[in-house]
Amino acid sequence: DGNYDWENDDITTKNFPISPEMIGKKVEVKTKLFHFNRDISSEDAISKMDKDGYRPATLMELLVLGFLFPELQRQFPIIALGSVWCDADDYRYVPCLSVYDSGRKLNLDWLVDVWDAHYRFLAVRK
């Protein structure tokens, strides 16, 4: 449990299924927070991660980051582009760690065309 002050109700195992082979398994991964210091599209962010030998993190990997480093999201919002959920209206969302008032928030952000420069993107070494 990440002890978030607020969690989006749409973050469920139904919307973000866990592959059966991963349940109960401990996997070590090398992660990196990408910050581009400029507005960037999801496509460009993923391309730059790929060029550096990384892939976008999933919701599960983002949750581990939030558990291990609970104060990090107070500095900047952190996006996991590796997990996308599409709602009934065909809007696409990605998991995000951020703050709400002074509390830690686990939310879904719209998968936008361009992300503001203050966002960070969690990635995992391939």
Predicted regions and their residues:
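A binding-site-centric feature that preferentially detects glycan-recognition modules on secreted/surface proteins
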Residues: 1-55, 60-126
